[in-house]
Regions:
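Basic, amphipathic "hinge/linker" alpha-helix immediately C-terminal to the N-terminal HTH DNA-binding motif
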Residues: 83-102
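Key DNA-contact positions within bacterial/archaeal DNA-binding proteins
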Residues: 62, 118
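Short acidic, hydrophobic short linear motifs in intrinsically disordered regions
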Residues: 44-52
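Alpha-helical residues within the helix-turn-helix
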Residues: 55, 72-73
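Short, hydrophobic-biased segments on the C-terminal half of alpha helices
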Residues: 68-69
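A short, conserved structural fragment
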Residues: 73-80
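Mid-protein regulatory/catalytic core that forms ligand/cofactor-binding pockets
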Residues: 128-234
Length: 241
């Protein structure tokens, strides 16, 4: 009996998946999550502290302290008096590799398996720690070398550092007018919120004003009045039309 094209894709996916990881650096899923956490905190705010990491990772402060000691010893991090923890070149490369895997998997889940954009993050979180570089290279080729993930994030090429294309957040917008949503943070609750309000990548929005009293960003989206909190506005990246 012949397999359908969908079944063939799934068979190939899991056949390569079981080959496991091929890495020179001794990494664990937990350590990889810490690296991503430090990178993500660094893109949103100033000093990266043990307290911020513990809150973001939802772990105890002693657990963070222990992991930071290991990562400093392995030269994945350095500690700066003003900035807190900073990723070294090695740490940045490992983070870029993780985002490359994660985002390629997300594209695969949407394009080949029919997932919606708010469903893919958790699946990709699991798979990114398991797949080999051989798998990732094959996946990238099969997907015709996509440049962005379903959330608008840049997919770095092999051995290249992650450089996001869009950096202006909705929270930083001051001039009323029309904007395009270009990228959003890969956060489950945020993605569920955006899905609920039908806010999508490359969608045009009309920024009306920031209301100081309610502390909400007032938007018009296809004739719908939408109010966005500062926390959400900080995670939506836009481009002025």
């Amino acid at each position: 009996m012949e397999l359908s094209s969908s079944n063939c894709i799934l068979s190939a996916f899991f056949a390569i998946l079981v080959l496991g990881k091929q890495r020179g650096q001794k990494m664990t899923p937990n350590k990889e999550d810490y690296l991503k956490c430090i990178y993500e905190i660094g893109t949103r705010q100033g000093k990266i502290t043990n307290k911020e990491i513990a809150q973001h990772m939802q772990v105890s402060p002693p657990a963070v302290t222990e992991m930071m000691k290991k990562m400093l010893a392995e030269e994945l991090l350095i500690k700066d008096k003003k900035a807190g923890y900073l990723l070294t070149d090695l740490g940045l490369q490992l983070v870029s590799d993780l985002y490359r895997k994660h985002r390629l998997i997300e594209v695969f889940l949407v394009q080949k398996l029919g997932y919606t954009t708010d469903e893919i993050h958790q699946e990709a979180e699991i798979l990114e720690h398991t797949v080999s570089e051989r798998f990732v290279a094959g996946l990238e080729k099969m997907l015709d070398f996509p440049e962005t993930c379903p959330h608008g994030g840049t997919i770095p090429a092999k051995h290249q550092l992650l450089k996001e294309k869009y950096h202006q957040t909705l929270a930083s917008v001051q001039e009323p007018g029309n904007y395009l949503i270009r990228r959003v943070h890969d956060d489950f609750e945020l993605l569920a919120y955006l899905e609920k309000h039908n806010l999508n990548i490359d969608q045009e929005i009309n920024f009306l004003q920031y209301d100081n009293y309610s502390q909400l960003y007032q938007l018009d989206v296809d004739g719908r009045a939408i109010q966005v909190s500062p926390m959400i506005a900080q995670q939506i990246y836009v481009e002025k039309l």
